[in-house]
């Protein structure tokens, strides 16, 4: 087995100073996200979503960012999945973007809310047919006897709905409204740059540097 203690790299690609960042964290995120897209990183909108259930047990998984503006970060999923149940019990959640090739991370913390039905409807309608049928066929996070059961359900819903399945009531969007963001840039000697934004009582953002 590979010696885990020997797996390391030196970070040399960039730096991040307080004078470099935008005054608004969403503008700063858009700047970095656009650079990740320009660099042709695979799935730059992939993010880890961390939630905590009613029992206090945390869990995390990769989801895809599907919208982002001054209101927050939007993603879509099954409301009855583990993450959906977690967020119903505890709306506090966190996101993590890791753009390895750029030696960058972005952490986002905040509260999650469901988006309006028309927003969920519009995104659902834009998905490929297979994905729309999959939202019906999968009772997400529940045990299933085998893959053949999923494929049978998908076939049944395809026969039922044809080319125009409606959005299931149990599927839709969430928006994480941020209260804190951190931008991390790898640096040599593990003295990484960490610039954090924290929302103030008046809605403005305070920018601070954190020790690595």
UniProtKB/Swiss-Prot annotation:
What cofactor(s) does the depicted protein rely on? FMN
Cite the cofactor comment: Binds 1 FMN per subunit.
In terms of Pfam families, this protein maps to: PNP_phzG_C, PNPOx_N
Q: What class of enzyme is it?
A: oxidoreductase
**Annotated residues for binding of substrate:** 8-11, 66, 123, 127, 131, 190-192
Q: What's a Gene Ontology MF term here?
A: FMN binding
Q: Which domain of life is it from?
A: Bacteria
Under what name is this protein listed?
Pyridoxine/pyridoxamine 5'-phosphate oxidase
Upper classification of the source organism reads: Bacteria, Pseudomonadati, Pseudomonadota, Betaproteobacteria, Burkholderiales
